[in-house]
């Protein structure tokens, strides 16, 4: 198991919270909660060691050219593909009311 932390510039925190995915399914679970204004914080707990660069690139692609809401995101991963990670994050953003 490996724990990774990332931070990105962000706007204002949303009012909502979201929990998407199921960690026990061999997939991943994503919890999105309002964060500190101006900061998006992501913590990833993953069963895949040595994947920090892959996670970093995934988040950089997702947030490039846009200002995400200020969130605290916790991801519990059990080997999900980058496409599934992005899908779960997009589902979470939709649930909290941010496009």
UniProtKB/Swiss-Prot annotation:
Post-translational modification: Covalently binds the prosthetic group of malonate decarboxylase.
Family, similarity comment: Belongs to the MdcC family.
Record carries keyword Lyase: no
Heme keyword on record: no
Protein name per UniProt: Malonate decarboxylase acyl carrier protein
Annotated gene: mdcC
O-(phosphoribosyl dephospho-coenzyme A)serine PTM positions: 25
GO terms under cellular component: cytoplasm
Pfam families reported in the protein's UniProt record: ACP
Molecular function per GO: acyl carrier activity
UniProt keyword terms in alphabetical order: Cytoplasm, Phosphoprotein
Compartments it resides in: Cytoplasm
Role played: Subunit of malonate decarboxylase, it is an acyl carrier protein to which acetyl and malonyl thioester residues are bound via a 2'-(5''-phosphoribosyl)-3'-dephospho-CoA prosthetic group and turn over during the catalytic mechanism.
Species assigned in the record: Pseudomonas savastanoi pv. phaseolicola (strain 1448A / Race 6)
Transmembrane feature ranges: none
